[in-house]
Each structure stands twice: as C-alpha cells, then as structure tokens.
A protein has these predicted regions:
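Glycine-rich, acidic and aromatic/proline-enriched surface loops and short helix-turn segments
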Residues: 6-12, 55-56, 257-262
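Aromatic- and glycine-enriched glycan-recognition loops and surfaces
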Residues: 28-34, 231, 288-296
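Solvent-exposed loop/turn elements at secondary-structure boundaries
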Residues: 266-296, 300-358
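Outer-membrane beta-barrel pore proteins
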Residues: 1, 26-29, 41-44, 304-307
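Extended, hydrophobic alpha-helical segments in both membrane/secreted and soluble proteins
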Residues: 235-239, 249-264, 295-297, 301
Length: 358
C-alpha cells in the first residue's frame, strides 16, 4: 500500500482507539545468549559424578506478512524463550559385572510473546479494491493471538540404567520417568477484534464483525487472563538383552513399557455433561482418560558379513512410542466451556451477506 493509505489507516486507528501505530519499515531483530557450566568429580575409583548447568535466553521478532497482507510496524510480536536446566549424572561400578548409570534433571522453560501495546485488533479487507488478484488485507493493532500468550513448563526427569555383563550376554534393566507441570495462557482477541470489508467502511467505522474473548472473573478469582495449570507424567520401564552370538553377529531384543498419566483434572462442565449423557455420548468434561499401558517389544541385529569387518548389515523391527505431546492436551484445560468466554457479533441479511454492525 502507499504511504498515504498507510497514514490514512494509522490516523483513523488513532482516532478510534487513541493509540498511534507506525507504518515504516519494521526493525526485525533476533538474539540468543547461551551459558554452559560443568563439574566432573571422581568420587573414588568406582563412582563418578557430573553436574551440568545450561542457560539460554533468546528472542525472535515475528511479522506475519505476505504478498496479500500488510501489517503495521507495531502489530507483530516478539517471541521470547528462557531456558534453565541442570543435570546430575552418577556412574558406578557396583561389582565385577555390574555397572549403573543414574541421571536426574530439571528444566524450566519460559516462552512468552511481547507486543508493542495492548490495543484492539483491526483487519481491513479489500484495501485496493475487490479484485482478487490485486486486493490486499491490512492488519493494525495488537496481533490477534499474542495479546495474552505464554507457556511455562517445568520438567523433571529421573532415569536409571543397570547393566549386568554375563559372558556373551549384556542385560540392561532401566527406568525413565518424566514429570511435567505446564501453565498455558492462550487467549485470542483479548483486546477485541474488529473486521471491515473495505477501506471506506473502516474510515466510516462500519465493521461487519466483532469478537472478544476473556476468562470469566467469577470463576477465576477476578482474573480475566487466567491460565490453567496441567500436571502430567510419563513413566517408562524396560529390559534388554544384547547377545553376542559370534564375533560377527549380535542380537538385541527387549521390551519397553510406558505409562502416560495426567495428575489433575480440568474444570467440570455440568451443562455439557448433562447434554452428553442425554445423547448417549460417553464423554464428560472434567474427567481425564485413564492411564494406558503401552507395550513396545523390539528386536534388532548387527552382522558383519566377513571377518575383516568391512561390511556391516543392520536391521530390526519393533514398536516405538515417543513422548506424549502434553502441551496439546493442555488445551482441554483451556477449552472446558467454563472459564474461557467470548462473544462474536455479526449480522447477515436474508441472503447471507454481512451487514454493518456499527
């Protein structure tokens, strides 16, 4: 868009909201700072302890623009990340044939978005007319999803592996456990979002739609930007045997068991639960699914096809499961239909066309 059109939009936005936004070239920046410290302690001949601390602090400016979208200078957001983690690892020889590795860690991750100001979000369509090839959409105001957006994660990990050497067999027994605490604030249109179908309608302040979202202060103790906390974990146990059948061939087989759990429940929604029961749905807001045990058997081999060990053939088969994306599941704590509230106002005529609501 031209500078004259940008100034026209900025002046009208200031007139409507009292907030002045820029329309020059944005200063996009990103920085990262990292720190690593480590201590190794040989306690004695059989025990060694390692402590490691890692810190990272970074930010990255984001502007969601493309060939069909123009965003004003202060309408982007800055993504901030701060991570602190500490790891302790103890390795021990427990006898002639026993070796143990114990590891514990704690990570504290803070992700949040910064915006230049908290103001209404405005979207103006068809700024250069209604030709689909040449028109453009303009966004001004606080970015739609960034006015109230942060994710705090505390992750605690405990792992232990015991190896037992028995001739041509190496047995491994272990456990890997993770505890999560997540607090996720995500409220779109927290300052209100206004939608206009053309530049002329924006100058006349005639929107076709308005939306606003918040958390109910009567249910959150007066907080209109409340974030739910979710506590969860994943517990893993495994056993494995590495069998050296010959100098050229070994076989590894074992079983891993994982148990993902959620420790707390989202808020109950009696209205929905009553309706679901009447409809015969086996679903209730406020209840988590019961923990499910995941079995993952595996087998693999390594085969040197000749004594010179120049050619190696490897293969295996098994069932593999990764970490459960608990941050996605935490959305269920946000969207119970209780704390999170919102309104959308629009008006249509008999043919389904939007009318101005101003």
């Amino acid at each position: 868009i031209t500078n004259d059109v940008a100034k026209q939009i900025a002046d009208q936005y200031q007139k409507l909201t009292g907030i002045q936004d820029g329309y020059g070239q944005p200063n996009i920046d990103n920085k990262s700072f990292g720190l690593l410290a480590r201590i190794d302690w040989n306690i004695n001949q059989n025990h060694k302890l390692a402590l490691r601390y890692q810190h990272n602090n970074s930010y990255d400016d984001n502007y969601g623009v493309d060939s069909k979208t123009y965003m004003f200078t202060n309408s982007g957001y800055r993504m901030n990340n701060k991570t602190n983690s500490i790891v302790a690892e103890l390795t021990s020889h427990l006898g002639q044939n026993l070796y143990n590795e114990f590891r514990a860690s704690a990570s504290f991750i803070r992700d949040h978005r910064d915006v230049a100001y908290q103001g209404p979000t405005v979207q103006i369509k068809n700024v250069r007319g209604y030709d689909q090839k040449t028109n453009i959409t303009v966004n001004i105001g606080t970015e739609y999803s960034s006015g109230a957006n942060y994710l705090d994660q505390d992750i605690y990990t405990f792992e232990d592996n015991l190896s037992w050497y028995l001739g041509n067999h190496t047995l491994t027994f272990g456990t890997h456990n993770e505890i999560y605490r997540m607090k996720n604030l995500f409220i779109q249109a927290v300052n209100g979002s206004w939608y206009y179908n053309s530049l002329d309608l924006f100058m006349q302040d005639k929107p076709y739609q308005y939306s606003y979202k918040y958390t109910d202060p009567e249910l959150t103790g007066g907080d209109t930007q409340w974030a739910p906390a979710m506590k969860s974990g994943q517990f893993g146990f495994y056993a494995q045997d590495k069998w050296d059948v010959s100098n050229n061939f070994n076989l590894t087989y074992g079983l891993r068991i994982d148990i993902p759990v959620i420790f707390n429940n989202p808020t109950e929604n009696p209205t929905f639960n009553e309706y679901a029961a009447q409809q015969g749905f086996n679903a209730r807001v406020g209840e988590n699914p019961s923990a499910k045990v995941l079995f993952s058997p595996r087998v693999g081999f390594r085969w040197y096809t000749n004594d010179s060990h120049k050619t190696l053939l490897r293969g295996g088969v098994g069932i593999f499961t990764g970490r459960v994306p608990f941050v996605w599941l935490s959305n269920a704590f946000n969207n119970t239909g209780m704390e999170m509230k919102g309104t959308t106002i629009n008006k249509k005529d008999a043919e389904g066309n939007y009318l101005n609501i101003a």
